C-alpha cells in the first residue's frame, strides 16, 4: 500500500487548500474523511438503512437522502443517540477509508481527517501532517467565512483537540498563518520528502 500521510488541522486552518495544492501540483491521491462520511449514508447504503431503522423514515428528505439538519437536532439534546450514531458510522467510515487507500495509484496518499486526533485515526497513517494556525486566526477566518460570532467559534474550538494536542502528534507541520507564508513552497518541500520516503516504503 502507498505511504499514507494523515492531514489534519483545526477549523479554518486551511486543510482543504493544502490538500488541493498537493493534488493540483503533484497529482497526489486524496481520501477525504468528510466525503467518505457522506458516502456511507448515501441513498441505498447500509448506513442510511440503519439510521432510518433507528430514527424512522422522517429522518429522510423528500428525495430519500439523509436530512442532516433533522439528524443534528435529534442527537444534539440526546447524548445516547449521538453515541449510537458514532458507534454505527465510525467503523463504516474507517473501513471505507482503508478500502479507498488500498486503491491509491500515486506514490503516497493524503488522508484528510479534520478530527484525526479526536478519533485516534493516526493509526491509519505513516505520518501526521498538521496545518497549523494561531487561535486568533481561526476565530477571524471562521467568523468571516461562516458568518458566525466569536462565541460560536469558541464553542467549536472547545469541542476539537487543542492546538497543543495536534502539534504533539505531528511529524510534519505546515504554517498557514498569513498570505505571506509560501504555502506551495512548504508543500513542495514536503512532497520531495514524501517521495523519498515512499521509495523506501516499497
Swiss-Prot record:
Gene3D superfamilies: P-loop containing nucleotide triphosphate hydrolases (3.40.50.300). ATP binds at residues 12-17. Coiled coil: none annotated. GO terms for cellular component: cytoplasm. SUPFAM superfamilies: P-loop containing nucleoside triphosphate hydrolases (SSF52540). Residues 4-201 form the DPCK domain. One of its GO terms (biological process) is coenzyme A biosynthetic process. The keyword Zinc does not apply. Pathway: Cofactor biosynthesis; coenzyme A biosynthesis; CoA from (R)-pantothenate: step 5/5. One of its GO terms (molecular function) is ATP binding. Keywords: ATP-binding, Coenzyme A biosynthesis, Cytoplasm, Kinase, Nucleotide-binding, Transferase. Its main location: cytoplasm. It is found in: Cytoplasm. PANTHER family: BIFUNCTIONAL COENZYME A SYNTHASE-RELATED, DEPHOSPHO-COA KINASE-RELATED. It comes from the Bacteria. It comes from Vibrio vulnificus (strain YJ016). It is an enzyme of class 2 (transferase). It catalyses: 3'-dephospho-CoA + ATP = ADP + CoA + H(+). Its EC number is 2.7.1.24. Catalyzes the phosphorylation of the 3'-hydroxyl group of dephosphocoenzyme A to form coenzyme A. This is Dephospho-CoA kinase. Belongs to the CoaE family. The keyword Cytoplasm applies. HAMAP family: Dephospho_CoA_kinase.
